[in-house]
A protein has these predicted regions:
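Extracytoplasmic/periplasmic, Sec-exported soluble proteins
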Residues: 157, 188, 192-197
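A short, well-structured edge-of-sheet supersecondary motif
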Residues: 71-73, 141-185
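Active-site SXXK
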Residues: 193-211
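Short, solvent-exposed loop/turn and secondary-structure capping segments
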Residues: 83, 175-177, 205-207
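Aromatic-enriched hydrophobic runs in primary sequence
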Residues: 121, 163, 180-186, 190, ...
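Long, charge-dense tracts
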Residues: 2-146
């Protein structure tokens, strides 16, 4: 893994990274991104809080993304080792599982724009597209005779992470699958666009020329 540095704001159970953009590391293979996670308490953690958050390794100069989760314990002054697991990727040519435990350092501090970061996070949550499991699409539109199994029939299950349909203002999505179960932060999974970006770019360029 590249050396990583994160700054978080906690609001209740929400663990919000201050920077959620692509971070360019000094490591030759991987850049990375992080996304909002959760913090909670468990009775056996001896006064520590427990946290987890999704992160993504992005292959440098490529579209390959490996999605994972990090977890650790913390209190007001210190942090445990960080455990991580990566069991999903978006490319056929570079598939692997990665897991381990790393030393971490924790510096308590006041985040200068904490209120703005928190407000932006909850505003983002409030304005997300309505989402439903794709399994209810057929019951939402019984006259359409939707057959969910046909939607992914042309793909290989072990190479399919997720799929969905956006219809009538609702985002119907499948589970986000990994080789070891469902991804805990499905809405935060980073998925590259590949040829979609190239197709949209051309259309947008023509639209701008038309204006």
């Amino acid at each position: 893994l590249p050396e990583m540095s994160f700054e978080f704001v906690q609001s209740g159970s929400h663990l919000i990274p201050v920077d959620q953009s692509l971070v360019y590391s000094n490591q030759p293979t991987w850049n990375y991104m992080v996304a909002p996670g959760r913090a909670w308490n468990e009775s056996g953690d001896q006064g520590f809080s427990r946290a987890s958050f999704p992160f993504a390794l992005i292959e440098r100069n490529q579209n390959c993304v490996h999605n994972g989760v990090m977890t650790f314990l913390f209190n007001d002054t210190t942090i445990s080792n960080v455990r991580y697991q990566v069991t999903q990727e978006t490319c056929m040519y570079f598939k692997f599982d990665m897991w381990g435990q790393l030393k971490a350092a924790y510096t308590p501090s006041q985040v200068a724009n904490a209120e703005a970061v928190t407000a932006a996070h909850f505003d983002w949550l409030k304005n997300q597209l309505p989402t439903k499991p794709i399994s209810v699409l057929a019951s939402d539109y019984p006259n359409a005779k939707v057959n969910e199994t046909l939607m992914s029939s042309g793909t290989t299950p072990e190479h399919t992470t997720t799929f969905g349909v956006f219809y009538n203002g609702v985002n119907y999505i499948s589970n986000c699958n990994t080789r070891h179960g469902k991804y805990a932060y499905c809405s935060e999974m980073r998925l590259p666009s590949y040829s979609t970006a190239k197709s949209v770019l051309a259309g947008m360029a023509y639209m701008r020329l038309g204006q």
